[in-house]
Amino acid sequence: MTPIIGISTNLHTVDKGKFLGMERIYVNKDYIDAVVKAGGIPLLLPPVADRASIVRYAEVCDGFILSGGGDINPILYGDFPHPCLEEFHTGLDRAQWALTEEILRTDKPLLAICRGIQLLNVVLGGTLWQDITAIGHPVMLHSQYSPREDIFHPVSIEKDS
């Protein structure tokens, strides 16, 4: 049977034009394309506060991707916002936090990318460097302007992880 892969979505407030102030739910198309290419069925999971919906997401999906996105509100992991932070949506953070907890209860496969791995970290009790350059030594470029399919850094995947 073809696996259904739930993909967390993000929130953007329109900042110009006809729909100024409207909130949009989105995910980058790359996530959808990758799931389809791997033989899965992508299912976008809008952020909801309703516990019953979150539980149902976890039941329906065979695996999950916590997608990349904006900054997580540092208040949620016991810190104060650094001046370098971009916009954040605490409601989105709380909804994705609850989704992540439910995914962890299911023990189903989970791939967390960028914001997703940061979210997983704080849900499990970790903290974050809000400004990666503040750690005091050179770091790799984290926002590339080259084509997305270009390789920028190695990734090691542990067997059975």
What is each of the regions a protein language model found here?
Residues M1-L111, V122-W129, T133-D160:
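N-terminal beta1-alpha1 cap of cysteine-dependent amidohydrolase-like domains
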Residues C114:
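Conserved G/P- and acidic residue-centered "switch" motifs that form tight phosphate/ATP-binding loops
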Residues I117-L120:
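Hydrophobic, aromatic-enriched interface-forming segments
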